[in-house]
Amino acid sequence: IVMTQTPSSKSVPVGDTVTINCQAAQSVYSNNRLSWFQQKPGQPPKGLIYYASTLASGVQQDPSRFKGSGSGTQFTLTISDVQCBBAATVYYCQGYKSSDTRAFGGGTEVVVKG
């Protein structure tokens, strides 16, 4: 499975909204086996959203700011009310087709202006 993630970088002012798109070359398992991961500078990636839209437990930032949506081959992560703390954070999608067929998107870096 091949995951195409866009954009590779997004520059937004504080308080704005970021939309990240992820497209699978073929439908993921059960149409919803798509995860989003969040990687802050100097840290390993952490699970943010599972099953396309289910927020992971223990998300430290305001969980209401993160929303996952989509099904089949098209998925979206929306981050609202971007904060300074979001700067240089990279988000990755991961599609799951089977136990030995899963892949990450190329990542999207959030650049915060101001």
Swiss-Prot record:
Region Framework-2: start-end pairs: 36-50
Q: Which superkingdom is the protein from?
A: Eukaryota
Region described as Complementarity-determining-2: 51-57
- Cellular component annotations (GO), alphabetically ordered: immunoglobulin complex
Tell me the keywords, alphabetical order.
Answer: Adaptive immunity, Immunity, Immunoglobulin
Q: Which InterPro entries match?
A: Ig-like_dom, Ig-like_dom_sf, Ig-like_fold, Ig_sub, Ig_V-set, IgV_Light_Chain
Tell me the segments the record calls region Framework-3.
58-93
The keyword Metal-binding is assigned to this record = no
List the residue ranges of the region (Complementarity-determining-1): 23-35
**What ranges does the record give for the region Framework-4, renumbered to this chain?**
104-113
Q: Where is this region: Framework-1?
A: 1-22
Matching Gene3D superfamilies, A to Z?
Immunoglobulins
Q: Region (Complementarity-determining-3): which ranges?
A: 94-103
Name the Gene Ontology biological process terms. Answer: adaptive immune response
Q: Misc remark for this entry?
A: This chain was obtained from antibody to type III pneumococci and was isolated from the serum of a single rabbit.
State the name under which the record lists this protein.
Ig kappa chain V region AH80-5
Q: Which organism is it from?
A: Oryctolagus cuniculus
